[in-house]
Amino acid sequence: VNTTDWPAADFEAHRVHLRSVAYRMLGSLNEADDAVQEAWLRLSRADTGDVRDLRAWLTTVVSRVCLDMLRSRSSRREDSLDVHLPDPIVTRVDDDPAEHAILADSVGIALLVVLDTLPPAERLAFVLHDVFAVPFDEIGPILDRSPAAAKQLASRARQRLRNAPAHQATPRGSASAAAAPGGSGDLARQWTVVDAFLAASREGDFEGLLAILDPDIVLRAEAGAGPFGPSVVVRGAREVIAQAQRFAPLGRFARPVLVNGAPGFLVVRDGEPLALMAVTVQDGKITEMDVLADPARLTALDLTAVIP
């Protein structure tokens, strides 16, 4: 292989993989693109004569860039009490998530929210190993740790995920059974629950809602300067039902969509997106709801596939 041709010939072949890694590390599509661009700049300046596996080399580079970004973000956010949801990827209900390369090994919004609570090194170790099957002997050097220490970081991350509300430990290659659909049959069962929720909401059926919502459900709403009141985190079925009344008048404008490959719906009125809701379903109950109603963030989303 003539490695001097790598920057021009092969970087694009790895761009989608690198963006997928960065998105799961950062939960931000714009920051993921920035990290990938930085990897390209470093590749273009590097002497790659000794590089034998460009994909692994680039994965290491983009992971280090993401680690620096996470550490910088942690220092900025440590005093912030605002609700901040990760960037969602919104597609049509009839889309196959597998056809969207960035959604391979889909990580749902609910899991990304929990990943945002992890220390940067734990998040990196978990994402690289459990989602992308990178061995610990490659993860250790990225973190300036031994492979054994990297393994311990991933284990600690898994434990935090187990202890998070409505989350379970999951095997490598599927970062969250709760946050990503496990197949067409599983997705159909989830839609049955979501459709029942919408119907009960529109009819004001309190008992019907209680039957659908997990008693320990968590609702996170990022409202920004929108018309729905302040951003909130609410726990418990009765409390969530009370909060959901804020959105009830707009129920007739809700259209089903996939949010990171899992059920959700987008509220659109007169062609304008007003709110996006991602729903996590486990064992026939809704365990988490994440609502993005910040007008500035909604405007920035790529919704061309779902708003004609």
Question: Predicted regions: what is each one?
Answer:
Residues 209, 217, 284:
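Hydrophobic pocket/interface hotspot
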Residues 264-270:
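Short beta-strand segments that buttress and anchor functional surface loops
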Residues 1-197, 205:
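Active-site-adjacent scaffolding segments
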Residues 292-308:
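Low-complexity, intrinsically disordered terminal/linker segments enriched in charged
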